Amino acid sequence: MKLVRTFLAFVVFLGACATLSGVDPEEWEGFQIFTNHHVEINVRFDSAEGRLVLNVFNDDNLTFYQPGESVFWIKDNHLFTLPTPVPDGLSTLGEPGDEIYLLPSSLASGDQERILHGMSGYGLGNNDLVEGTAPMILADVSGPGDVLLWLNSDEVYWDTGRPEGEFGFFENTPGGHHHRTWGFNRRGIHILTLETEGTVKATGQPAVTEATSFLYMIDPRSHEWWQLRHFGFEALKPHAALDHPSPANGLPNLISYAFDLDPHASSLAGMPRPEIRLSDDGKRRLALRHRRPQGDPEKETRSDLIYQLEGSENLHNWTPLEEGDENDYRLISNGEDDDGTPLLLAVLNETIEDSPYRFLRFRIVLNSQ
């Protein structure tokens, strides 16, 4: 019940915005990662070119950022439950009891763990456009789920449940600073493409505009960080899918992800390789040396993968093996690869003479949870 009450409070309450921690975004792989920041999608007018420009403004450090380098990371502390009944205007998000990711329009004093995300018109003057305001038009959305932006259930600005091309708009004001409630009903990578428009007051001509994309990581899984790192804003394209073979080395992206290989490089040097290990007892054991990336504790941990070691006598029939001193094999640390990636050895417990297996391989499984 607590989650439902919190959701309803966010729908109807628009209070003073809490001041957040005043920190810069985290830099990661060429991206600026916004998590618990006070940050807006901003529109400004470039009078020299008669152009309306969309960018990102961070209120915490009063700095503008390019959309192509900005990522909004929405963690699982934004997870809420839809109430019973779901207000009519919000039905696109799901059924009563469904979980959604909710970005609130305001934060309680002292809440520094969630994002405060809005719209602003810094750099847009009262006399720049004939219309005065500049609409933030949601032109397209790529991703696994739906997106809504609303003030209340009777005033929904964006709704991807509407027909394509009619998702809606939010009217941004000159110098404005607006916060509304956002809802995403699926985890994963979402890319929102926005457009704006207006008539230049000084010339009477339409302002030059272009579609601009903004990337949201909604409670992402580890492999989605890998896709972002290697494919950027093309992370949702077919060639970035885990089951897609890399044109550079022919490996499925899932294999490149599992062993932290560059999908754009032709080299296969980082693939697992067999070894004969001479143990402390003087006996030889078959082993498989492989990269086991650790990554950032909150990013590329490979926590969504299962590394299933399998053994075979003839390369035709394969048997799943269990890890453990009393089972089939042990995992032991084997230093680092040339790029610092941790190396592990999967070493059979039985000697070469006693083991029924002459060949080893890993079966990589993406955990569905």
Which positions does each model-derived feature cover?
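Short tyrosine-centred short linear motifs in exposed loops/low-complexity segments
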Residues: 178, 186-190
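Short strand-edge motifs at loop-to-beta-strand transitions and within beta-strands
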Residues: 178-182, 344
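Bacterial N-terminal signal peptides that target proteins for export
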Residues: 1-8
